[in-house]
Amino acid sequence: MKHLFKLDPAKNLPMNDLTKLVHSGTDGFIIGGTDNVQIEAVQKLYELLGETDLPIFLEISNESMILPEADHFLIPVVLNTENSKWTHGLHQELIKEMGAFIPWKRVTAEGYVILNKDAKVAHLTEAKTDLTDEDIVAYARLAENIFHLPIFYVEYSGMYGDPEVVRKAGAALSNTKFWYGGGIRSKEQAAEMAKYADTIIVGNIIYEDLEKALETATIFRKKTV
């Protein structure tokens, strides 16, 4: 997977726009959000995407994101916070409550480093965003070599990140997949971050300028002679 669209169930998107996203050349979708997430909206969005053969990931920020019928679940583990609630606290509580029913083969953990200090998710998780390049590289190595996380996710959350930081983080990883998300609003930015990340995630621009969002996926289409 090189490209994923991230959809917020709290935001409305016409069916025609969803159809365009499905046929854009993207490799799949993440359904996830921070604010005002209701299970009914998650269910509706998941069902609207249900006709596609593309993978649909539910990113579990709270219990309202859990649909038992989903094929793929993403579990964020925020690495750059001192609040253990976001590294393992909420996770342990949910496992305690539902552990016997969790379909572990459909669950993937992602090690998050959140780097936009103004983002809602940074405030919510109390993320320490004032990091050096060396700090971020160390988190990448921590994710891969200590926690053995399958995904390391650098999240600028609405702000376009520093390509050099992304390059260094990606170069530090061998087996863990490197995902980048944040502020991609053009095919040029998509191509730039795709040089360093295994997968780029495109979100906000979907709701701001759909055509530009679609262009970010077209760069990955296989060319035919």
Curated annotation (Swiss-Prot):
Its cofactor is Mg(2+). GO terms for molecular function: heptaprenylglyceryl phosphate synthase activity; magnesium ion binding. Pfam families: PcrB (PF01884). It catalyses: sn-glycerol 1-phosphate + all-trans-heptaprenyl diphosphate = 3-heptaprenyl-sn-glycero-1-phosphate + diphosphate. Pathway: Membrane lipid metabolism; glycerophospholipid metabolism. The keyword Lipid metabolism applies. Its EC number is 2.5.1.n9. Keywords: Lipid biosynthesis, Lipid metabolism, Magnesium, Metal-binding, Phospholipid biosynthesis, Phospholipid metabolism, Transferase. Mg(2+) binds at residues 8, 34. InterPro entries: GGGP/HepGP_synthase_I, GGGP/HepGP_synthase_sf, GGGP_HepGP_synthase. Sn-glycerol 1-phosphate binds at residues 6, 153-158, 183, 203-204. GO terms for biological process: glycerophospholipid biosynthetic process. Homodimer. Prenyltransferase that catalyzes in vivo the transfer of the heptaprenyl moiety of heptaprenyl pyrophosphate (HepPP; 35 carbon atoms) to the C3 hydroxyl of sn-glycerol-1-phosphate (G1P), producing heptaprenylglyceryl phosphate (HepGP). This reaction is an ether-bond-formation step in the biosynthesis of archaea-type G1P-based membrane lipids found in Bacillales. Belongs to the GGGP/HepGP synthase family. Group I subfamily. This is Heptaprenylglyceryl phosphate synthase. The lineage of its organism: Bacteria, Bacillati, Bacillota, Bacilli, Bacillales.
